Amino acid sequence: MSDIPSNEQIRTALDNAYAYAKTVQGGKNASYIPALAQVPSDLLAIAVVTVNGDLLTAGSADAPFAIESISKAFNLAYVMDLIGMKQLRAKIGADPTGEPFNSVMAIELHGGKPLNPLVNAGAMATVSLVNGSDSDEIWGNMIHNFNNFANTALTVNQEIYKSESATNQHNRGIAWLLDSYGYFYNTPPMIVDLYTRMCSLNITASQLALMGACYANGGVNPVSKKRVVKEENVPPILAEMCMSGLYDSTGDWMYKAGLPAKSGVGGGLVAVAPGKLAMAAFSPPLDPAGNTVKGQAALQSIIRELNLNLFRS
């Protein structure tokens, strides 16, 4: 791998990506969560954080949005540190499902075991493994982990949380199904609530890029200098992001971008260039798979301009 791009190179790539992404059309806000449908569709933000801790932004980089499924990639770090990679893989698995992120079919076809921690079934099972004697203690451990990644105190978007809690019957069904097969490790209603709360965290593109930069920096937050995940657990987490980070269009993303990434239906996207930097984008309109349209275009533009694709020699 070549050296970290200079801040001047990043600034140019960032400005070019922002200008390009503004012209990209298509996509619609997530409609199945009412509060997400109301987010202004014209918002666009891009942020880059290097392993040196430098932050560069374009657009509405401090506009908060719901982290949604991106949270899965960071709660995964806490649980992997807690119980170890081998035990986590035995309980949850590490393979793409080939199905939509909220599918129950993959559970039924594989004896009730969730296949990976970045789809809803596996992510809720991962939350069920977080330590704590009650809901408050479990949430305290979860939010402490997120705050360490973001180097700030994150808060729950109450409007999103209430909206999702009123419409998460499908996730409740998934949790009970996993429990019936013996692949759920705490009380389903409590865990679904904690999972919903986790997905409702407010985040900004700047904060999300810093969270990703912790992975780019081998598990150490490049701003606070705190270790937030064991170094040996970073590669398997990034591998999961390569396999399942953008739902059932992850293959298309990897074909075009060649970097581990994670998206959320709130319009966020984070990608990691190991040893160099992480980048995040926010734009609410989504493609049919649930990924930000402009965000993908923006980050792919930066990846091309800075030659960050992992598969380029």
Swiss-Prot record:
Primary enzyme class: hydrolase
Provide the leader sequence positions: none
What keywords are annotated for this sequence in UniProt?
Answer: Hydrolase
Q: Which residues form a coiled coil?
A: none
Query: Matching SUPFAM superfamilies, A to Z?
Result: beta-lactamase/transpeptidase-like
**EC id:** 3.5.1.2
The reply to whether Hydrolase figures as a keyword in the UniProt entry is: yes
Q: Which residues cross the membrane?
A: none
Where along this sequence does the record place binding of substrate? 69, 120, 164, 171, 195, 247, 265
Annotated GO biological processes are:
glutamate biosynthetic process; glutamine catabolic process
Q: Which InterPro entries match?
A: Beta-lactam/transpept-like, Glutaminase
Per its record, the protein catalyses: L-glutamine + H2O = L-glutamate + NH4(+)
Its domain of life reads Bacteria
Q: Indicate yes or no for the key word DNA-binding.
A: no
Extract the GO molecular function terms from the UniProt entry: glutaminase activity
Summary of subunit composition and partner proteins: Homotetramer.
**Protein family:** Belongs to the glutaminase family.
Name this polypeptide is given? Glutaminase
What organism does the record attribute this protein to?
Akkermansia muciniphila (strain ATCC BAA-835 / DSM 22959 / JCM 33894 / BCRC 81048 / CCUG 64013 / CIP 107961 / Muc)
Taxonomic classification, please? Answer: Bacteria, Pseudomonadati, Verrucomicrobiota, Verrucomicrobiia, Verrucomicrobiales
